[in-house]
């Protein structure tokens, strides 16, 4: 089991320092502490597939948006039924989220969304894009822009292309990548202290 991932460990250290100087409120410090504690309790993955730790990072990172979602929020798991990798990852993610994954003040409830039907997705607060959708990622970009909702994924290439707002990796260390243009299109902005700890494209 790993210790607290470095990005969130650094966030907590920053929060502690700023809290002593009165420059940051207790809520932000509490969020940082919750992230570090939650992720430290998740075992390291034994394979390259999406992991519970990846999902925890995604969920916690959504809490650092300027207008973070709270309460029960449907997260659309976007997948391509004709792609075995995408379909398997969607099934795995649905199982990991179960009846609802709690992260701080947020509980994510999975909703399966076929990529060709993403434009008609109903009450969804965010999208979780699976790997293997390829060029169809452009449909996600269009949906996040029209619906003004964030997209998260472990497929960093989709973030680099602008199809998805945020990508995460939890091993060998936590890394978070945000596409600034995609975030702006989706109406998503992040807390300044969080932005110092991520990579923006």
Could you say what each language-model-derived stretch is?
Residues 1-25:
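N-terminal secretory signal peptides that target proteins for export/translocation
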Residues 2, 8, 43-201:
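Short hydrophobic alpha-helices and adjacent helix-cap/hinge residues
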Residues 13-16, 39, 44:
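Intrinsic disorder/low-complexity segments in short proteins, especially the signal peptide
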Residues 30-41:
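Bacterial N-terminal signal peptides
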């Amino acid at each position: 089991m790993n210790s607290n991932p470095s990005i969130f460990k650094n966030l907590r250290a920053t929060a502690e320092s700023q809290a002593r100087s009165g420059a940051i409120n207790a809520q932000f410090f509490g969020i940082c502490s919750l992230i570090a504690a939650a992720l430290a309790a998740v075992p390291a993955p034994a394979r390259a597939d999406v992991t519970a730790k990846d999902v925890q990072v995604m969920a916690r990172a959504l809490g650092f948006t300027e207008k973070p979602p709270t309460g029960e929020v449907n997260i659309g798991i976007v997948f391509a039924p004709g792609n075995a990798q995408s379909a398997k990852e969607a099934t795995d993610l649905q199982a990991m989220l179960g009846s609802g994954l709690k992260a701080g003040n947020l509980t994510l409830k999975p909703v399966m969304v076929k990529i060709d039907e993403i434009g008609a997705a109903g009450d969804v607060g965010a999208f979780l894009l699976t790997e293997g959708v390829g060029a169809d990622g452009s449909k996600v970009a269009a949906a996040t822009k029209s619906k003004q909702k964030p997209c998260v994924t472990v497929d960093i290439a989709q973030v680099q292309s602008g199809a998805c707002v945020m990508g995460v990796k939890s091993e060998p260390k936590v890394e978070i990548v945000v596409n600034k243009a995609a975030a702006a299109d989706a109406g998503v902005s992040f807390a300044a202290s969080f932005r110092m700890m991520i990579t923006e494209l």
